[in-house]
Amino acid sequence: VFSMQWLDGDSDRLARMESVIRETAEEIADTHEMALKYGPLLGLEPVAMDTYLREALEQSAQEHAPKQWRVMPSGALHDATNVSALMPAAMLFVPSIGGISHDFAEDTKEDDLMMGLKVLAGAVDRLI
């Protein structure tokens, strides 16, 4: 069993990526005489996060961590996607050690967690 997740904020690009992934998987399966079966796809559309909340996070990041942050339009299917149907939502990411994410080995340096909290607090201050 092998699973993949690919993310983007553009649904057309997601469809093109899926096509390339399927074609590549089929080529590999044919080369190695392997059976290939696809499970159910979520089929959820990416949702843009709230502009006002994102701007507050960006301004706070610039204040607390100048030149150490970037905008990351993930289009990810996080809880924020479901929440955004009911209320404004945005996401704040902090770096994982070694870039390992969504894995039991995922970890984050305490300094990065503290900086993330400062950025979040600064954004909240701007919003209230």
Listing of model-derived features with the role each one plays in the protein:
Residues 1, 13, 17-24, 49-57, ...:
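General structural feature for long, well-ordered alpha-helical segments within catalytic domains
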Residues 1-19, 26-29, 36-43:
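Midchain, well-structured core segments that form catalytic/ion-binding scaffolds
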Residues 12-13, 18-24, 67, 94-128:
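His/Asp/Glu-rich mid-to-C-terminal helical/loop segments that flank catalytic regions of hydrolases
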Residues 35-95:
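Active-site-adjacent substrate-binding region
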